[in-house]
């Protein structure tokens, strides 16, 4: 019985589990998809900057300004996520890509805000 499980059922389960992941595309974006990722990242950065500038006179804490801007601009990255998932890319990979774009733009915004606040004093 042990040999039947090891040599019959285990390979079948392995093939089934591999087929579950085979339906997703790889990370090889088409030119249009790559351009959409680049544009969405730029739009997100622009949105963060515009939102932060509108809040800079009302708040004196850079972290609060950055948090508000990130919440206000989250829809840009959500649309990118939805598009790539609907284009049949793995949701985990898309989540990492979108998270990386978000982190990069947010860290840059926070750095710029802190620099601006220091110059303002």
Can you describe what each PLM-predicted range is?
Residues 21-29:
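Cleaved targeting-peptide boundary
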Residues 32-81:
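Short N-proximal segments of mature Sec-exported proteins
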Residues 11-14, 71:
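Hydrophobic alpha-helical membrane-embedded or membrane-associated segments
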Residues 63-121:
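Compact alpha-helical subdomains of small soluble proteins
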Residues 1-9:
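Bacterial N-terminal signal peptides that target proteins for export
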């Amino acid at each position: 019985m042990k040999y039947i499980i090891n040599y019959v059922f285990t390979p079948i389960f392995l093939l089934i589990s591999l087929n579950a992941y085979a339906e997703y595309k790889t990370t090889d974006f088409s030119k249009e998809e790559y351009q959409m990722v680049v544009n969405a990242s730029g739009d997100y950065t622009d949105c963060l900057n515009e939102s932060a500038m509108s809040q800079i006179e009302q708040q004196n804490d850079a972290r609060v300004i950055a948090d508000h801007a990130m919440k206000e601009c989250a829809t840009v990255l959500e649309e990118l996520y939805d598009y790539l998932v609907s284009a049949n890319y793995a949701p985990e990979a898309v989540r990492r890509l979108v998270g990386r774009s978000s982190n990069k733009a947010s860290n840059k915004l926070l750095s710029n805000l802190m620099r601006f606040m220091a110059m303002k004093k």
